[in-house]
Amino acid sequence: MNPNRNRSGIAWIAALCLSFFAMPAFAQERAYSDGPVTNVTAVKVVDGQFQNYMSYLQKNWKGVMEEAKKAGYVLDYHVYGATPHNPNEADLYLVVTYPNMAMLDGMTEKMEPIQQKVTKMNFREADEASGKRGVMRTLLGEELLRELLLK
């Protein structure tokens, strides 16, 4: 009996067994990677308050977003107008894109100094001002979306 022949047979069987483990790992590779995270806020602007609310967004919200971009907290932001299908749907969307889900951890603590710098209001004053904007708009809700980047 040739001992080399026996070794090559064992090596072949070992290689075959290892290939069974490699195939599931290959098959399990994701076809995408996690991309940026976008927060979409649906807003219903009160009739007659559109210009007032847009002025607020231009004066305060935009400034806060620009500073957040400079700090690296925000990748981009947009304001979208919409044509609602019924009177209870949003007619404005505030869209903010963050680099990743982890960036949302501690976001309030990150944004407070920026908000204070831009608006010259402390947290309590900013919270009160947000409540007063209720005469201009109703916040209908938020949706968090993660972009899935196809490989």
Per-segment meaning from a language model:
Residues 150-151:
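Short, solvent-exposed mixed-charge patches
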Residues 41, 53, 94, 104:
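Hydrophobic pocket/interface hotspot
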Residues 2-14:
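Bacterial N-terminal signal peptides that target proteins for export
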Residues 22-24:
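N-terminal signal peptide c-region/cleavage motif recognized by signal peptidases
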